Design a protein with these regions (language model features):
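Flexible interdomain linker/hinge and immediately adjacent N-terminus
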Residues: 138-184, 296-298
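Short, charged phosphate-coordinating catalytic segments
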Residues: 131-135, 208-232
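Basic, Lys/Arg- and aromatic-enriched nucleic-acid-binding interface segment
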Residues: 182-215
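Short, basic (Lys/Arg/His-rich) helix/loop patches that form interaction surfaces
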Residues: 190-191, 309-359, 363-367
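Active-site/catalytic core of tyrosine-dependent DNA strand-transfer enzymes
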Residues: 262-323
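Non-catalytic DNA-binding core/recognition domains of DNA-processing enzymes
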Residues: 42-136
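Catalytic-site neighborhood detector that most strongly recognizes the C-terminal catalytic loop/helix
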Residues: 361-390
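Conserved tyrosine-mediated DNA breakage-rejoining catalytic core shared by Y-recombinases
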Residues: 220-267
Length: 400
């Protein structure tokens, strides 16, 4: 079991922070944390970004520990990683460590974007470290040697890192949605959850489906964000919120916005708050919408990311139709259904559609993010158009 890990904590002013530590000694690693502070935190990056960068750097030092490499000493002597060591490092960045330490990683590798990010972060960190440790040796040859070393690492990044080259089937089809809400129906025989949490969990998926919310947006919702008279729900940004007890604070990455809610949905929210949430111990100490029900010291506290993912995992295992379920797939589903609804309304121009979609999803005006979420609909339209074109061809309907 490797002892290098990322530890997260919260300052008194509410700022979330993380650092790379040696679990055996409890000591933070000097250079990795200097890098995180000066190159990441001071650029005002979010805690989420800090954590993934720190995770990649901790992975690098786990590799060094495994290979018995003193990287500071090697750099000072200008004995950079040899080609075979770089190959070993690249292979190490491919491994999935989600299930434990060095001895417990999954055989399956991480996906290309994750590997690409890890290698890029490792290369950027090592370039910075070389400049720090060799600052006294500012000769042109030294700089060339360092950049050759860094470029040898960057060349190993996987190709085809196009963010638009994604699987078409990201959204759920009608059969999957029917299965999902049949399972989640409070009091239903198929419901895998205890009765006391069934309303809460059903509402979680209703909000994900109705608004295409991100997990951070969902877990960041407060009762005060809901206007029951106007039937609206506000999405608010609250980075480093001192009143949020969660160290891993759910963040809203998108723009703030106000969403209109159907009266039936507002009723479900109101019913949950008045007849369900209020019965839980400590629930009156804050107004975060979703809370922990499990008895113990965390009862009544805001629902954590880990609890949210556990809920999704239990639902995923409840039906073979939902084997690939993630909360984010409902965001793709919302976009697919939005595109179909727009197609039925011929009065809405493409420009207006883009504006409406961007607002409801919280994207900045002019963002090309919609291309990612709209791939399934575009694929179906292109398929329909191609088939109609071929049908005309076989009917002899094209002019010479």
């Amino acid at each position: 079991m490797c002892s290098i890990c990322v530890d997260s904590f919260m300052f008194e002013n509410g700022e979330r922070y993380c650092h790379v530590v040696n679990k055996d000694t409890g000591e933070p690693l000097y250079y990795p944390n200097l890098y995180i502070t000066t190159q990441v935190r001071n650029r005002s990056e979010s805690i989420s970004t800090m954590k993934v960068i720190a995770g990649s750097i901790s992975l690098l030092y786990r590799f060094f520990m495994r290979k018995n490499i003193n990287i500071d000493e090697r750099i000072q002597k200008k004995l950079f990683l040899a080609p075979h060591e770089i190959e070993d490092l690249i292979e190490f960045t491919s491994l999935n460590f989600r299930d434990g330490g060095d001895g417990n990683f999954r055989i399956l590798n991480v996906k290309k974007p994750t590997k690409y990010f890890r290698i890029t972060t490792v290369a950027n960190y090592l370039e910075w470290l070389c400049k720090i440790l060799l600052s006294h040796a500012g000769q042109e040859n030294t700089i060339k040697e360092v950049m050759a070393f860094i470029n040898n690492i960057k060349r190993k990044r996987p190709r085809n890192n196009d963010k638009y080259n994604m699987e078409i089937e990201k959204s759920l089809n009608k059969a999957q949605l029917d299965s999902l809400f049949s399972i989640l129906s409070p009091g239903g025989n198929l419901n895998p959850f205890k009765e006391k949490v069934q309303k809460r969990n059903n509402l979680i998926f209703l909000l994900l489906h109705c608004f295409g919310l991100r997990a951070g947006e969902l877990l960041n919702l407060r009762i005060g964000d809901i206007d029951f008279a106007e039937s609206t729900i506000a999405i608010r940004r609250r980075a480093n919120d001192k009143t949020d007890s969660r160290v891993y604070q759910p963040l809203v990455k998108t723009c703030e916005r106000k969403l209109i809610a159907d009266t039936k949905l507002i009723y479900e929210v109101s019913d949950y708050i008045l007849n369900d949430r209020r019965k839980i111990k400590n629930s009156n100490k804050h107004d975060f919408l979703f809370i922990t029900y499990k008895e113990g010291k965390t009862q009544g506290q805001p629902l954590s990311f880990s609890s949210y993912h556990k809920i999704v995992s239990i639902v995923r295992q409840s039906s073979s139709h939902l084997s690939g379920l993630t909360g984010h797939k409902l965001r793709h589903t919302w976009n697919y259904e939005f595109s179909k609804a727009i197609d039925k309304n011929q009065e809405i121009s493409d420009e207006k559609e883009q504006q409406i979609r961007s607002y409801l999803m919280g994207w900045r005006p002019g963002s090309d993010t919609s291309i990612i979420y709209n791939r399934r609909h575009i694929f179906e339209l292109s398929k329909k158009t191609a088939l109609e074109q071929q049908e005309q061809l076989f009917k002899g309907g094209f002019d010479e």
